[in-house]
């Protein structure tokens, strides 16, 4: 036997020794449906184990002749026809158990205190400052009469029954605020108008400056061109002399 075949055979034996055998249809650890714990049909789980499975169940998987329940720290398998297996699958399918159900319940319990609100007391309407104080009194009382209040409530009466001085000061304050707001608005309008006029004048001045610059450049170019032409074609001196007829008498 060649040496490489011997090494290959020893390697295959070593790998086979590392892989643990499966238990019936359970499959090995390298299979598609492994189980960390197999519960026999003759010894179903206790109530404590069932509560643990209902609470921490992530999902389940149908294998050949059993069902595998996946937990956070391993998997538990049971026969497909076992009563506890059928109950656990039905509970998980209805959403009544499992980790998803536990998270939903915890979320609802967290939202419950936030949704519970203390009923707010109705706010008392503020007194109307534009009407006299007598309009806030009941119609059965005369303007000169004062409402009878129980003893120990003088401060509450002062707060609930506004006086004419308070109304007058409130009206004066509101009128002063209105006049001040009107003056501020007029001043703001003037400032806006001045700003708009200045912003409209800037483009006009810029356009005039550009026109003046272009005109100056054009005049400079024309003068330069005329000077060059006069240098290239000097004037004929004979054109400046006019022939004069000779005097016969002389």
Swiss-Prot record:
Glycosylated. The chain crosses the membrane at residues 201-221. Its main location: membrane. Disulfide bonds join 33-63, 35-77. This is C-X-C motif chemokine 16. It is found in: Membrane. One of its GO terms (molecular function) is low-density lipoprotein particle receptor activity. Induces a strong chemotactic response. Induces calcium mobilization. Binds to CXCR6/Bonzo. Also acts as a scavenger receptor on macrophages, which specifically binds to OxLDL (oxidized low density lipoprotein), suggesting that it may be involved in pathophysiology such as atherogenesis.
